[in-house]
Amino acid sequence: MARIAGVNIPTNKRVLIALQYIHGIGQKNAADILEKVKIPLDRRVNQLSDAEVLQIREVIDRDYLVEGDLRRETGMNIKRLMDLGCYRGLRHRRGLPVRGQRTHTNARTRKGPAKAIAGKKK
């Protein structure tokens, strides 16, 4: 089992799929990484040499923001919005949808489970 960016990637899968187990790397980024390192897309992780794994690791460390660093930056961006007091920050602070969705009905994912209100039943 190869370990890249602090994540154990599965050995029996294709490298293109296995790289997507790393937070911050999707299908496009995984294909770009393999293209830079010149590894065929259909090769499996257990067929990679240690040198190839090292090359992949170096490309990811150099060019991509992944795992904890990406989560930290995302959290800091949200915290910055909340500290500014802008509209998006207020919506984050109140736990409401940020991107203009309606809240009169729906938005249950963001608002949490419905609260019972006495006298609402007919």
From Swiss-Prot:
One of the record's GO cellular component terms: cytosol
Keyword Repressor attached: no
Region entry Disordered, spans: 99-122
A Pfam family: Ribosomal_S13
GO terms under biological process: translation
Protein name: Small ribosomal subunit protein uS13
An annotated Gene Ontology molecular function: structural constituent of ribosome
Biological role: Located at the top of the head of the 30S subunit, it contacts several helices of the 16S rRNA. In the 70S ribosome it contacts the 23S rRNA (bridge B1a) and protein L5 of the 50S subunit (bridge B1b), connecting the 2 subunits; these bridges are implicated in subunit movement. Contacts the tRNAs in the A and P-sites.
Source species of the chain: Rhodopseudomonas palustris (strain TIE-1)
Subunit structure: Part of the 30S ribosomal subunit. Forms a loose heterodimer with protein S19. Forms two bridges to the 50S subunit in the 70S ribosome.
Keywords recorded for this protein, A-Z: Ribonucleoprotein, Ribosomal protein, RNA-binding, rRNA-binding, tRNA-binding
PROSITE patterns: RIBOSOMAL_S13_1, RIBOSOMAL_S13_2
Family label: Belongs to the universal ribosomal protein uS13 family.
